[in-house]
């Protein structure tokens, strides 16, 4: 039997000295509660050690260019293969990265266009062909014996002027005749051309009669004409037509030259191909007037101009005062009071000079005569000239990304877009959905020579497109920017890229690849994972999805609890072996001993509804959607069907603009009816709760403020005069100044990875010695930050305010996180649950709309059960909950389902079904209904077995 991967003494993070042997060339799933230690074992131990050993095998010179991972806390690992990690945190933040560049399909497209494209004039649209001298000579001989020709070299094409200097130079060079505007002249004669008219001048190189033995002379004449005409020449048949030839890519009609089609001119990341206006980004930041003045009824004096609060002495308002005076208006007017001409000038700027005085920062007052700049160009200029990050960030809220006005989002120069394959340029190909590209390339009509060149390129493109389809990304376009992809989409793109590499004998480690996938797409993903395994690879998948766990060859269940209560192997083996272990929560859910029950009855709501009319943003097909208030609604549908567009971009942003006077971008919809029935809108997304390690769950929820207040009330703190600020690690006073309250110091190592060592002064405690001398129940402030939520609950049992917040964090499944855990180390799901807990801590007013996008991300079935209790409780209190979700355990307990589809991308964007889960199951063309029906039936069966038929 082949030796597996042997792990001995794994103690990384919360792991409890794990000893484990994993089989090779199998699909292995690590399961367990959130925070049980799955990622610690998979990524922080197995992958880290595999990567470290690989980098260590390289030379010291090579190592300095590679990030090296720290050695995990482990005795040893044997039998490791080269390891590749495909997680969700490695998403590109580069606006130049697209689906096409990440998957390398764009590189193959560039090669295809360089070798098998056809050129068309960007001005007149006529085909452009490049010909060699031999090809031109052969074409002329084919005109037939006794054909009389004039070989002409064009020296001026549609150019104004008398061209006297040009004609004189031609005389000096010994040329005898020219053709000007189709009239033949001798250069010895005086040629008069009108100065203000466009003229075309061609030099007569030779006059030839086609006959046997003429090829040598014809070749010399053609070469001379091409040289004089800069790659262009004309063969004029006497008493017949002109034949235009080009040795370059140049239009014979317009004279427009195109560059040689090489791969670099089709790259928007190369100056030879990138649109010069947007530098290949395809978009530019422009000031948005709707954000600058969201309410056009408010006067300028009361702050109508949001980016620039009213101050009569500033440069803007001195100008504006003079501008309004010209229209006999004052600062007490609003934008809507302006005449139409003034509105245009206010937005874009005027031509009339305004007289106004301005006192600068040195106290000097000067008189100025300037035209009003216009609020839109001024906002853009101030953003570009901002000298602090904070100012730039503030002004960025009033800018939106718009397609480049020159390339219209194509990213490339017009010359690059002149080349076509299958009558489409490379930008048009990139804008097609992956599902449409596959048949396009399969049915591509190429000439025989082009087929030979393109065969291998098309094979690679076909494979990569197929892999994208197999991981459920058929709705994406190659031009989609990588920064706009969700974590799950980005991970599956990297997965598709790895499949394309065809590597064998590799250890792949994946982090919840099923996130964001509809059950139908999940089936394709599982087939892909099995295909990678069958190639001869080992796959370790950290996953909560039941179908993935059931499909595994080997399951390792980590637990039994989270945090300090986890870190042990509760069960390992096949599905049947894990189901037999009573201590395994995963096994019990798989077996059916534990399950999430159906609600006793479905709510019908409070009689009111939110109605979205005419939603047509992105791929939405002008749909009307009703969302019942006072109910738990779930929006379902395949990846790319329009769920996030409908709920996040239209419902949340549109409702927020109505209720809170925010200035989100104007998504395409007609109206939202029923906004008056909602008091508050809360969007609980998966964006980080902070961008720095100083942010944590305790600071975000204000829990830390209460804890600092408690420490300041101790007798020792009172005696020393310490206020709550003394116990903050963000400000001077109580923090350790050696590490500025970080607790660690980074040491840069040239040949090794950067090393983070505990601060020598505070030894990682973050505070100075005097602050740490203050204790509450024997613990100092640093000790408290190192506690998990579960540990802190009994510690603060006598403080209701702190206890209530801690219990809320525990209820949302975050009992395992440390109070001081940096926000930068939290997953999107953890950040979302911190936000949910923060909202739950606030006083409930009822009539609140809660929006959550895939809240089950990273959650075990047991955690989902707890989360659903909280969400149902919110609805019971008179609120409305709208959730975007694929997890069928959540979908089955909804009061209402809005199912979008039927598929993703252009094939989605319609309401497939609406109603209760039972009603959705009856809709035959609903993919959600097809997968939901057996889940509801199984749950009913389990409820009947456990509780009898109610």
Regions found by a protein language model. Name each.
Residues 1-950:
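Conserved phosphate-binding elements of NTP-dependent enzyme cores
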């Amino acid at each position: 039997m082949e030796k597996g991967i042997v792990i001995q003494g794994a103690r990384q993070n919360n792991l409890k000295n794990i000893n484990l042997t994993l089989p090779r060339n199998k699909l292995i799933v690590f399961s367990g509660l959130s925070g049980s230690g799955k990622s610690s074992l998979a990524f922080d131990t197995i992958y880290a050690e595999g990567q470290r050993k690989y980098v260590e095998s390289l030379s010291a010179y090579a190592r300095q260019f590679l990030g090296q991972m720290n050695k995990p806390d482990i005795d040893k690992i044997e039998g490791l293969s080269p390891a590749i990690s495909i997680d969700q945190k490695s998403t590109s933040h580069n606006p130049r990265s697209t689906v096409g560049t990440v998957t390398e399909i764009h590189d193959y497209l560039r090669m295809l266009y360089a070798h098998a494209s056809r050129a068309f004039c960007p001005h007149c649209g006529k085909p452009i062909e490049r010909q060699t001298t031999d090809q031109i000579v052969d074409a002329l001989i084919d005109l037939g014996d006794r054909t009389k020709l004039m070989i002409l070299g064009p020296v001026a094409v549609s150019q104004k002027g008398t061209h006297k200097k040009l004609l004189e130079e031609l005389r000096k060079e010994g040329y005898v005749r020219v053709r000007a505007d189709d009239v033949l002249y001798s250069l010895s004669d005086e040629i008069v051309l009108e100065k203000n008219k466009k003229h075309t001048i061609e030099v007569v190189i030779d006059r030839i009669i086609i006959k046997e033995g003429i090829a040598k002379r014809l070749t010399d004449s053609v070469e001379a004409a091409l040289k004089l005409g800069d790659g262009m020449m004309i063969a004029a048949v006497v008493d017949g037509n002109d034949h235009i030839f080009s040795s370059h890519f140049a239009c014979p009609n317009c004279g427009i030259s195109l560059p040689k089609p090489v791969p670099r001119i089709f790259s928007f990341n190369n100056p030879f191909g990138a649109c010069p206006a947007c530098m290949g980004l395809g978009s530019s930041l422009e000031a948005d007037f709707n954000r600058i003045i969201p309410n056009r009824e408010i006067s300028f004096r009361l702050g109508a101009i949001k980016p620039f609060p009213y101050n009569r002495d500033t440069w803007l308002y001195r100008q504006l005062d003079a501008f309004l005076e010209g229209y006999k208006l004052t600062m007490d007017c609003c934008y809507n009071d302006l005449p139409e001409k003034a509105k245009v000038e206010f937005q874009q700027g005027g031509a009339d000079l305004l007289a106004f005085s301005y006192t600068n920062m040195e106290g000097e007052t000067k008189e100025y005569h300037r035209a009003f700049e216009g609020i839109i160009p001024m906002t853009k200029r101030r953003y570009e000239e901002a000298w602090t990050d904070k100012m730039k960030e503030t002004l960025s809220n009033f800018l939106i990304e718009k397609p480049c006005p020159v390339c219209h989002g194509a990213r490339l120069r017009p010359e690059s877009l002149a080349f076509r394959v299958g009558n489409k340029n490379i930008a048009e190909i990139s804008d097609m959905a992956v599902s449409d590209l596959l048949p396009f390339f399969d049915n591509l009509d190429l000439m025989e020579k082009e087929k030979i060149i393109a065969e291998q390129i098309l094979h690679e493109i076909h494979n990569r497109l197929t892999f994208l389809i197999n991981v459920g990304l058929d709705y994406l376009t190659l031009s989609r920017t990588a920064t706009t992809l969700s974590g799950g989409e980005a991970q599956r793109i990297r997965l598709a890229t790895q499949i394309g590499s065809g590597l064998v004998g590799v250890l792949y480690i994946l982090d919840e690849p099923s996130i964001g996938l509809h059950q139908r797409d999940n089936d394709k993903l599982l087939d892909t994972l099995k295909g990678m395994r069958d190639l001869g690879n080992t796959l370790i998948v950290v996953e909560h999805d039941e179908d993935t766990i059931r499909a595994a060859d080997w399951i390792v269940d980590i637990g039994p609890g989270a945090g300090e209560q986890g870190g042990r192997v509760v069960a390992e083996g096949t599905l049947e072996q894990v189901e037999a272990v009573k201590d395994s929560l995963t096994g019990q859910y798989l077996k059916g001993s534990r399950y999430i029950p159906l609600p006793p009855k479905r709510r019908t709501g409070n009689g009111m509804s939110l109605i979205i009319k005419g939603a047509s943003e992105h791929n939405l097909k002008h749909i009307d959607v009703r969302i019942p208030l006072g109910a738990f609604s779930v929006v379902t549908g395949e990846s790319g069907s329009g769920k996030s567009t409908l709920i996040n971009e239209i419902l949340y942003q549109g409702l927020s603009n109505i209720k809170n006077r925010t200035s989100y971008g104007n998504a395409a919809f007609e109206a939202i009816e029923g906004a008056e029935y909602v008091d508050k809108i809360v969007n609980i997304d998966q964006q980080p709760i902070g961008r720095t390690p100083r942010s944590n769950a305790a600071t975000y929820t204000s829990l830390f403020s209460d804890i600092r207040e408690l420490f300041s009330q101790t007798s020792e703190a009172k005696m020393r005069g310490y206020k709550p600020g003394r116990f903050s690690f963000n400000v001077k006073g109580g923090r350790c100044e050696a590490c500025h309250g970080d607790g660690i110091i980074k040491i840069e190592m040239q040949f090794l990875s950067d090393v983070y060592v505990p601060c020598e002064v505070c030894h990682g405690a973050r505070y100075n010695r005097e602050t740490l001398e203050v204790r509450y129940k024997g613990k100092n402030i640093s000790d408290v930050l190192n506690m998990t939520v579960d540990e802190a609950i009994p510690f603060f049992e006598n403080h209701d305010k702190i206890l209530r917040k801690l219990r809320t964090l525990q209820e949302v499944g975050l009992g395992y996180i440390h109070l001081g855990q940096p926000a930068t180390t939290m997953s999107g799901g953890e950040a979302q649950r911190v936000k949910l807990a923060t909202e739950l801590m606030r006083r409930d007013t009822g009539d609140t709309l809660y929006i959550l996008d895939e809240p089950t991300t990273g959650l075990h079935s047991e955690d989902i059960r707890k989360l659903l209790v909280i969400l149902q409780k919110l609805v019971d209190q008179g609120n409305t909950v709208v959730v975007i979700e694929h997890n069928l355990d959540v979908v089955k307990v909804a009061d209402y389902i809005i199912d979008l589809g039927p598929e993703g991308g252009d094939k989605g964007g319609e309401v497939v079904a609406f109603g209760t889960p039972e009603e959705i199951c009856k809709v035959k063309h609903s993919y959600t209904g097809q997968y939901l029906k057996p889940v509801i039936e199984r749950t009913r069966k389990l409820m009947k077995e456990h509780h009898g038929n109610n």
